[in-house]
């Protein structure tokens, strides 16, 4: 069977710098975020376990190298798997450095999340990606980066476009919103201009604005707030929306 290797990078366990200055700030931040993290995390983890074959979790590259999954093919992808982590570092695990020597490695729709790499990083990426049997990437800029590294790759579509409509329909879960009856905003970054635009667009169309988020603080950003929908509900809200406004593709 296909398995998804689950690794938790150390920087994902760190608090944001603004809240990491003193023990009191860390305590306040943890208290504020605990409930929403637990609820959203449970929904996400439940969906992952239902839809994916997961390995046991690994927290270090050493654990992966010593006890990683045995497979015929190791695949990287998709999205910004070769981009920087939250702390700015680049994790070589996403270049499959833990795989046994001689293992077949491939990448599907991988992305660098940037258009340039520093000289030291170019050396690391060149060394590791040369071990891949096949590399496919998502963006024009990723093809250009591969060429800078002296590597060849093919451009492919994001895997979200591979399944047919029936597949996505099968994932839908019931929601209390009629098709075409609302505008939907899904927002990642705090941007007052986008908030204002979404509210104005919905008002001009004479439709209510719904806002989906797993972050409680977005309840003050405008629109009817819908907290932490399940993946199936999330898809259904997008499908039924008259218009979707977002800063995330």
Where would I find each of the regions flagged by the language model?
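An anion/phosphate-binding loop that grips the pyrophosphate of nucleotide cofactors and donors
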Residues: 71, 132, 241
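Catalytic donor nucleotide-activated moiety binding site of glycosyltransferases and closely related
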Residues: 104-114, 142-145, 187-189, 193-231
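A short beta-strand/loop micro-motif in the catalytic core of glycosyltransferases
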Residues: 132-139, 244-245
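Donor nucleotide-activated moiety binding/catalytic core segment of transferases
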Residues: 153-161, 165, 214-247
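A short helix/loop element that forms part of the nucleotide-sugar donor recognition site in Leloir-type
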Residues: 167-177
């Amino acid at each position: 069977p296909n398995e998804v290797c689950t690794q938790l990078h150390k920087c994902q366990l760190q608090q944001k710098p603004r809240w990491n200055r003193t023990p009191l700030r860390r305590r306040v931040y943890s208290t504020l975020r605990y409930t929403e993290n637990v609820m959203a995390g449970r929904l996400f983890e439940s969906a992952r376990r239902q839809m994916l074959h997961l390995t046991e979790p690994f927290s270090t590259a050493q654990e992966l190298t010593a006890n990683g999954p045995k497979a015929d093919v190791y695949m990287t992808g998709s999205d910004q798997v070769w981009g920087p982590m939250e702390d700015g570092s680049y994790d070589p695990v996403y270049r499959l450095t833990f795989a046994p020597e001689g293992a077949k490695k491939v990448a599907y729709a991988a992305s660098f999340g940037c258009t340039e790499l520093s000289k030291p990083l170019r050396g690391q990426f060149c060394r590791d990606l040369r071990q891949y049997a096949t590399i496919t990437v998502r963006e024009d800029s990723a093809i250009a980066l591969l060429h800078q590294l002296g590597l060849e790759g093919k451009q492919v579509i994001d895997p979200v476009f591979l399944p047919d409509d029936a597949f996505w329909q099968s994932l839908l879960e019931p929601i209390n919103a009629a098709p075409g009856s609302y505008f939907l905003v899904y927002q990642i970054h705090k941007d007052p201009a986008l908030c204002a635009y979404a509210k104005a667009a919905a008002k001009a169309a004479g439709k209510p604005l719904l806002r989906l988020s797993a972050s409680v603080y977005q309840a003050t950003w405008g629109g009817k707030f819908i907290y932490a929908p399940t993946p199936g509900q999330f898809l259904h809200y997008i499908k039924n929306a008259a218009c979707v406004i977002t800063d995330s593709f």
